[in-house]
UniProtKB/Swiss-Prot annotation:
The gene is fadJ. Residues 593-610 have a biased composition (Polar residues). Residues 590-614 are annotated as: Disordered. It comes from Yersinia pestis. PROSITE patterns: 3HCDH. This is Fatty acid oxidation complex subunit alpha. Heterotetramer of two alpha chains (FadJ) and two beta chains (FadI). The lineage of its organism: Bacteria, Pseudomonadati, Pseudomonadota, Gammaproteobacteria, Enterobacterales.
Amino acid sequence: MGASATNSVTHPAFTLNVRPDNIGIITIDVVGDKVNTLKAEFADQIATILQQAHALPKLQGLVIVSGKPDSFIAGADITMIAACRTAHDARVLAQKGQSILAQIAAFPVPVVAAIHGACLGGGLELALACHSRICSLDDKTVLGLPEVQLGLLPGSGGTQRLPRLVGVSKALDMILTGKQIRPRQALKMGLVDDVVPRDILLDVAIQRAKAGWLNRRALPWQERLLSGPLGKALLFRIVRKKTLAKTRGHYPAAERIIDVVRKGLDQGGPSGYEAEARAFGELAMSPQSAALRSLFFATTSLKKETGSAATARAIHRVGVLGGGLMGGGIANVTATRAGLPVRIKDINPQGINQALKYTWDALGKRVRSKRMRPTEQQRQMMLISGSTDYRGFERVDIVVEAVFEDLSLKQQMVADIERFGAAHTIFASNTSSLPISQIAALAQRPEQVIGLHYFSPVDKMPLVEVIPHEKTSEETIATTVALARKQGKTAIVVADRAGFYVNRILAPYINEAARCLLDGEPIESVDNALVDFGFPVGPMMLLDEVGIDVATKIMPILVEQLGPRFAAPPSFDVILKDGRKGRKNGRGFYLYSNPTKNSSPTKNGNSPAKRNSFKWRKNKVKPVDASIYTLLGVTPKAHLGAGVITQRCTMLMLNEAVRCLDESIIRNPRDGDIGAVFGIGFPPFLGGPFRYLDSLGADKVVQALRLLVQQYGERFEPCQRLVTMAEQQQQFYPVDANIDEVTDVAS
C-alpha cells in the first residue's frame, strides 16, 4: 500500500497523502455513510485538494481511491436536485460538476482512478475525467451511468467523455440503458485500461501514474466507421427510432441523451457540455424525473424498514417446500443472495433435481461470463440440499411453502412443519390467492404462520408481499421481512384479504380489457392502447403469457369476498371451454408456432401478477388468432379509441388502489406505488397509482369515474375515500414536501 506519507491534507470526505516517491493518493471516504456519494458541498473540497496537489513541485502523479471496503463512488447524491427549484438551479449544479471534473482532466500530471466496487453515475464521470482507470477483478465492481433510470442524463461530462473514450455506439448503449458493466467487459470496450486482483489494485494504479502520459487507445474500426459523417448519421437515425419504439415518448431523458451526444460530436466539446448542462436542468424539473426519483427514494426508505416494531429472529437455515419453478427460484435467491443454507423438500427426487438445476444454470451463466469462478459456483451450490422427507427441517428457522394452490394441502404442510420443524420455525406460504387465516386455521402455532408472495421469475423480480393474518406475531413479521431483504427483495406488508394488493388491483384492469374486446374492439387495439399508455405489455398478451386459466382462477375468490364488481366477463368461460390457455398450449388470444414449456404454470400456481414485466418487452409482436372473434361472437372493429380503452382499464385500477388504502390493505400510498410498479409494471414514469392520482387530481378522477358509471355501469362507482379527497381537495402526498421527504410522511 506504499510507505508512510510525507504530507497530509484532510477534509471531511477527502484525504491527500503524498508518498516518498511523489505519487499523491487522494482517498474518498464520506464520513458516516456506507458508500461514497458526491454531494454539492464536496465541490469546494475537491477544488481545494487539487490546488494543494498542484502546489507540490515534485508531484509525479495522482491516484484516486475509495476508503470504503466495497464502493468506489455509488453516484451523486440525488437529494441535491430537491434543493433546485428551477431548471436554472439544476443547470448550475451540473455546470459546477463539469467545472470540477474539468480540473481533474486538465491536471498537469497523470491522474489514475483505482476502482473497486460500485462506480456509478457521478462516480464514473469522475473516473472518466481521470487520465487512466484501473479496476479490480471483483464481482462487486461495476461501472455505469444509470441516470436515465431517474429521468435524467449524466450532467458532469459523461455524455461527452464516454463517446470519445469507447466510441459513440457503445456509449449510447450504456447511457440510454443505464446498464452496469463488469470489469472484463469494461476492459474489452476500453472503458478501463487494466483489470487486476483487488489486493494489487493500488500498486498497479501507482505504477500507472509513475509511467507518465500513455498513448490513447485507438477505437475499434467499427466505432471509427460510426464516427464518420455517414456512419454517424445512420447510427443516430437507427438509435432514435429504436428508442422511441421502446419508450413510446414517455421518457424524454432518452431523447435528450441522443441530442446531447450528437451535439458534442458535431459541434465540439464546449457546445456539448453546454447542451448537457441545459438538458440536465430541464430534465430535473420534468414530471417524469420527479416520479422516477420518488420511486427511488420510496424503495430506498422501504428497504430500511423492518415491517414491525419487533426485533427479527436470527435466520440461520431456510426450508423450501416444493421444487417447482417458484420453489427453485426461492431456494436460489436464499442461497446465492442471502448466503443461507436451504433444504428443499419435494414429493419426488425429480422435483429436487429441478430446483437444484435452477440455481446451477443461473450460476453457470455467471461462470461463463467470467463473473464467477467455478469454485464459487460449487461453494454456493453446497448451500442447497434436498430430500423427499422432512429430515433436516428440525434445524430450519423459516420454511417457505411453494406447493399447489390447494387449501387442504397447505394446511397439511403447516401441520407437518409443526411436527417436524423446530418450535420457533416460521411457516411462510407463497400462496397467490388463498387467505392466510385459512391456511393457519388448524395450526397449533398460528402466530408463526404468514404469507410471503413472490413474483416470477423469483431471481429477477424485486417485489414480495408479506401477508400477516390477525394472529401473526410481530416477531414473525419482522423475521419474514428480514429474510426477504437478505434475498435482495423489496417487501411491502399487506393485509390478508382476497387478492392481497397486487392481484386485487390487477383483476379489474384485466376484466375491463376483456369487456372492451366483447364490445368489438380488436385485441391488438386493446393491447396497443395500454402499451402506448406505458404498461410493458397489453392485458390480452399478459393473459396469454400468464395462462388464461391461471389468471382467471382468482376471480371467484374476489367475487365471493369483495362483491360483484370483480365478476369476470362470460368470455373467459367460453375461452377456457375451448381449451385456450395461452402460450403454454399454443392457443390463446395470439397465434403461437411452438408452445413454450417455460411459460406453463408450475405446480406452484402462478398468479396474474406472477409473470410480469421482466420479459414482456422482449416479446415480438404476434398475430392475433382471429378465430377467437368467432368463438366470442364478436365482429372486431376499432371504434372505442385508445383514450377510452385506457381510461376504462386504468380508472378501475386506480379506484381499487384507493380502496386498498382505505381498507388498510396497504400501509400507505408509498407501498401502493411500489407494489404496482414492481408487481405489475404500472408505468414507472407516472410514479405509481397514487402519485398518478395526485397529478390528475382527485376531483378529475371522480368526475371521470362518474361519467364512466353513466356509460358502462356501477363497477366504476368511485370509492368514498376518493370522493372525500375530491371534496376536500386533498392529495395522497404532501403538496409542499420535497420528493426525498415524502417517504418520511407517507404513512
